[in-house]
Amino acid sequence: STNNRLGLQKITNGSKHIDYNLFGTVTGRLTTYPRSFPILTMKKDFRRIIKPHNDWFLSLDYNGAEVRTVLALLNRPQPEEDIHNWNVVNIFNSPEYRNQDIPIDRDDAKVLFFGWLYNPESEVIKSNLYDRDAIISKYYNDDSVNTVFGRNIKVDKRRALSYIVQSTTSDLVLERAIVISKLLENTNSFVSHLVHDEVVIDLADEDRHMVPKIKEVFSNNKLDKFMVNLSAGKNFYNLEELKL
């Protein structure tokens, strides 16, 4: 469409560099400055124009990042399978919950979980496994959230849980990106960009042997070992899942 063409033209005529704003949000989630390449806001199908300097893009993100952060903050074990499927079986189809006729699938579980996480009034999760109050009492006092990364954010109690989880998840990813960047220091590969909870590596072919190590470093964060989704491709749109 004309709109798509104009949008793409605007991107290709603009800055080729990503200029992240580390202080753009109170939680620490990255934003970009107005003149930056719009990596965080561009349409997904425009990503095909983004190609690596080396041979591949390697993308890493956590499977159900914020759900896993909640479990980690409660010192609960991390399921070694897709977290939303795990929630279907262990939360939404558990005896204490099974009070509706419609079976809940993965997509439903995702919607229900985030509805519960961001709405303090929601009683949709009745399991003690996800204990909102325990997280709030540990990381919220004197009208402020205090995260494991030392962030102190003034916020009302209603939004405290979402701030704790968002900020902690964002910092987990940022901190791992820094460690991966150091790991790649004497190679041609480098951290290309971050998109929310995803770290993207510009990978040289000769560094392919490092992929399992990169995955391991990303997985083992400050809180626990999180399950990682791994994919690779020749541009930032066509990324295919890697099983490692």
PLM segments and residue spans:
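Non-catalytic nucleic-acid-binding interfaces of large nucleic-acid enzymes and RNP effectors
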Residues: 1-56, 63, 157, 192, ...
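Helical catalytic core of nucleic-acid polymerases
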Residues: 35, 41-160
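Catalytic palm active-site di-aspartate
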Residues: 59-61, 113, 189-204
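Short, flexible loop/turn elements at secondary-structure junctions
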Residues: 62-66, 169, 205
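Hydrophobic alpha-helix feature that most strongly marks membrane-spanning transmembrane helices
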Residues: 93, 117-118, 178-185, 204
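C-terminal polymerase-core module
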Residues: 120-123, 133-165, 202, 206-244
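Surface-exposed, low-hydrophobicity interaction/linker segments
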Residues: 158-159, 163-179
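Active-site palm subdomain of RNA-directed nucleic acid polymerases
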Residues: 172-195, 199
